[in-house]
Each structure stands twice: as C-alpha cells, then as structure tokens.
Curated annotation (Swiss-Prot):
Compartments, as annotated in UniProt: Cell membrane
Any Pfam family matching the protein: GTP_EFTU
Species: Streptomyces coelicolor (strain ATCC BAA-471 / A3(2) / M145)
EC number annotated for this UniProt entry: 3.6.5.n1
Xref: CDD domains: EF4_II (cd03699), EF4_III (cd16260), LepA (cd01890), lepA_C (cd03709)
Reaction catalysis annotation: GTP + H2O = GDP + phosphate + H(+)
Domain tr-type G: 17-201
Protein name as annotated: Elongation factor 4
Gene Ontology MF terms: GTP binding; GTPase activity; ribosome binding; translation elongation factor activity
Annotated gene: lepA
Key words of the record: Cell membrane, GTP-binding, Hydrolase, Membrane, Nucleotide-binding, Protein biosynthesis
Signal peptide: none
Amino acid sequence: MPAIPSHVPEPSRTDPALIRNFCIIAHIDHGKSTLADRMLQLTGVVEQRQMRAQYLDRMDIERERGITIKSQAVRLPWAPSHDKGATHILNMIDTPGHVDFTYEVSRSLAACEGTILLVDAAQGIEAQTLANLYLAMENDLTIIPVLNKIDLPAAQPEKFAEELANLVGCDPDDVLKVSAKTGLGVDVLLDKVVAEVPAPVGVKDAPARAMIFDSVYDSYRGVVTYVRVIDGQLNKRERIRMMSTGATHELLEIGTNSPEMLSADGLGVGEVGYLITGVKDVRQSKVGDTVTSQHKGATEALGGYKDPRPMVFSGLYPLDGSDYPELREALDKLQLNDAALVYEPETSAALGFGFRVGFLGLLHLDVIRERLEREFGLDLIATAPNVVYRVIMEDGTEHTVTNPSEFPEGKINEVYEPVVRATILAPTEFIGSIMELCQTRRGTLLGMDYLSEDRVEIRYTLPLAEIVFDFFDQLKSKTRGYASLDYEPTGEQTSSLVKVDILLHGDKVDAFSAITHKDAAYAYGVRLVAKLRELIPRQAFEVPIQAAIGSRVIARETIRAIRKDVLAKCYGGDISRKRKLLEKQKEGKKRMKMVGSVEVPQEAFIAVLSSDDSAGSGKGKK
C-alpha cells in the first residue's frame, strides 16, 4: 500500500496545477461506490477501522437499492508513484447514475475536468452509462475507460475492452482493468488520473466565481452547499451573492470533505468544497447557480443553469385522513433536501385531502414515496402517475393539465403531450419484441446501431405518458432483464387524447379519471369497469358502473342488487299474491335507487390505483 502523503496542502493555498477534479460514470451495480471506497482507503482519508461498504451513500435507501441519489465530493491527497515528492489533490465527485437525476449529473460533470468511465466486465456498457458518457463528451472531459469486476468468473475483459475502445476512440490496451472489491489496479488508476486529467484553469485574481453542483440540508447547520471554485477565491466570513436569485448571505463556514467535513479559511481556484451560510431552505442555493462575492463580485454568471422541471405528477393521499398535517410536514422536510420536488394541496371527493406532487421521473417518485413511508411512517395511496398536457381550445384559450380532473370540457382544438427520445440497449435477439413493445406504445423508430455483433442500440421517440406507467417492467420481462433504458425529453407533439371518466351509479369518481389515447380508451374503460365490478360489494339496489368519454358511455358493467326472497312465506297459493309481493319489492328497490349512494371501499381504490396490479395489464394491451 502506498505511503500516505505527510504534507497535504491547504484548500486556500493549493497550486491549481496539483489539483485534479474527476467523477465516476457508471451504471447501477457496476461497482462505483465500491471503487470510491477503495480510493478512500488507498489515499488514507478514512481509517481502516472506520471503513464501511458504500461509505459515501449516506441515505438508507441509497444503501439498500444500491443507487446514489445525492452527489458527494471528497478531497483525496495522492502522491503518484512516478513522482513521490508532489502531493496532488484529487477531488472525486460522486454522481448519481440514474436518468431522473440527469441535471444533477450534468452539473457534477461541469465541475470536473475528467471522468472515469466504469463498466462491469461481466455485463458491458448500459444505456444510462452511454447517456452520461455523451454528456461528459459534450462537456469536453478527458475520459479514462475502466473495466471493473475482473475478478468475477463471468468477466469477459477482452470483449468489453474492445466495445469500450470503439466508443471512446482509444486502443483496447488503454482500457484499465481493475477489481474495486479486491483493490487490484486501483493505485494504477489513481496514477492515471494524475497523468491524464488536466489541471483546472482559472484566474486567481479575478472576482470569485464558484458553481453549485449540489446542496443538502443538515438539521443542525442548515443548508450545506457544495461548490467548485472556477475563478478567484472565497474566504470565510465574507458576504456572498447567489447570481440567479440575487440573495446575499454571510459565509459562516467554508471547507472541504475528506469525507467528513473539515473547515478551512477559504477555497482557491479549482478547489471543490462546501459552504454554510445558515440558510434553512435548499431552494436558496440552486444546483447550477453561480456564487460570487458581494463586494467586487463577478458580473457574468457561469453558463448552464436550469430550473429543474417536474415531468411526472402523482396525487399522494394519506390512508388515514388525520395524517394530512404529518404528510405536509414530511414533504416540507424532503423539499429542504430536494429542490426538484414540487407539490400543492388538492382534494379529491373520493380520497379526501392530499397533495399533487411533481417529480423528475419514475425513480424519483418511487424514492420519495418510499422515504415518506419509511422515514416518516406514513401510509399513502398514490394515484396513477400522469404527465403535463397542454390543451388548446377552439376559442384559442390554453390550459395546462397536471391532473385528469383539470381536463377541460367543451370544444378542444388540439392536445399537446410531452415526448421523450428513448435509447434502449439490448442483445440483438430481442430486437423484434422490443420494437413490437414500442409500436404498441405509439413509438416512432429513430434509428438503430449495432455496438457489437450481439448488442444493439435502438432509438425511439415515445410519448412520456406511455413510459411512466409500466413500460420499464414490460421491457425487462420481454428481454429477460437484459435491456436497459434511458430517456431524455425532446419537446411535445399533438395527439388525439381523451379523458375517460368512471361513473358509479351516475356519479363521477374523480380518482379513477384518466387521460388516454383515443385508440386505447375503450380497452382502458372495459378493464377498469370489470375490475371495479369485482371490487365493489353488492348493494341493496342495482349499481351501474360506466366508463364514459364526455357524455358518451363506452363500457358498462352492472352490480346486481342483493334481493331478499319475498316469496319464502307463500306456500303454493295464488300467482297474483306472489306478483303483488314481487311488485312491492321492485317499488322499494326503485325508491332505494333514487336516494341510495354507493360506498367505494378503501381496498378498491388501493387495488385500482396501485401500479403493481396494473403492471400486468398495461394500458396499451388490448
């Protein structure tokens, strides 16, 4: 094991020529967090006895699902083997790898000069890794291709080294082969980072400019903002200004992560560290924003800042109505740590009080829902996720619809729905079933490339609404789990969409309304009324369940009335006597039907709205 450097330069006085900022791009489960663990051990910033697996993934849900959700930055001192005298500072920025968090990934990449492209030697490159690799190439980062898990019996390093070399445009021999688990080759990799990743370039005497690439909420210190200094220097106790909001704060503490927080007197050009200003709301320090000094500050912000826009909406309702204040408090707390989460209160006649919540994508929705249930102990019903539609009426007015109940009645000119460009990577034998699935989901083929003789990249334009429900599950089952999917929004298109309402006994039940394509509306209506017929208990009167588009009914099932045997007391006897009793019963049922109302049991809502149940019978199926 290499010697731990004895002299580590101060963050405010480090020569930028000795700094290397890099990140690791990898697919879920390709060993990124394990590689980060080995680097922490090799550089000696974490003692052997304090080491635990996935050291940087702090949230339980991150450790359990094996995914990274929040970016982390760690300062690692390293003396390369060819030059023991010069201690270099390696800033490793750990990025989320999932498609929902692409904006965070792009900001993390903008804070680096180089990236390690980490690929599992037993599985090869996946769609999300490919998407992040293209992002890295757009940011002109130096790419170091690495194959991990070469100690696995199933590893095929030669085959995948060739695939990587073709993608990155290097020689297959230049692809490093490491095992993060055993630590094999990790020191060579760190030497290569020092040798190949360029040093940060910045003007030391210019006004300070630093880019925020992440912010987290700490219950004791408020918001901790992670920044990369581009120009100038930020010092403790000076006043700083956020360039997108114009808000000013005092720097109470500044420092670096190694991986625990170490305060310093300032951060110089090229350094990566944290700022604490005592602010209590993450939305005050937005990812991608530029921080500068209030006195003699910079006039021009760094490019690339975007406000995160929710793509998928879902209603969250507490099972027990009295939990509503707890749900509000829980969402407030989560929003402190997640600026992309938006929500507003809404009421549903069927489900009571709840919130309409906007998410970046399906994983984001899943993670938030799981955190609400686990960390705050809430039992929730989530309505089927839906996307944002733009409806233009014949009189030219425009409506934005995030909830099926907001879909306007009357004469509609056109409806716009968001579309995404999806990239699917899969073995070539599954091309047919993947294309069939995409066609049923109203997809348009954009192109197809063979990465090697047995792996193909298929590109489709698909409506986002067709993906948000169960597309990924269907894709996995059709390809025996081998396909991987990545998507990015590419605007909107006009579609013939309609709103399907479910009527119980003539009354609309808002929780079951859905916006679907005209061709799939009939199948959706038939499926839902059949399901409700099984779930709603029989009443003392007949209950029609109807699916309707506007005033046109497209499907109907009837729950027959429970009838008492009124003829039981007639032994034999006259037919007119029996007829009289039956007529009397019929009258009573008719009166009941006039005033009766149908109670939909909670289980019926849960069964219809839970996506697990609908995953088997997706909307696209006929």
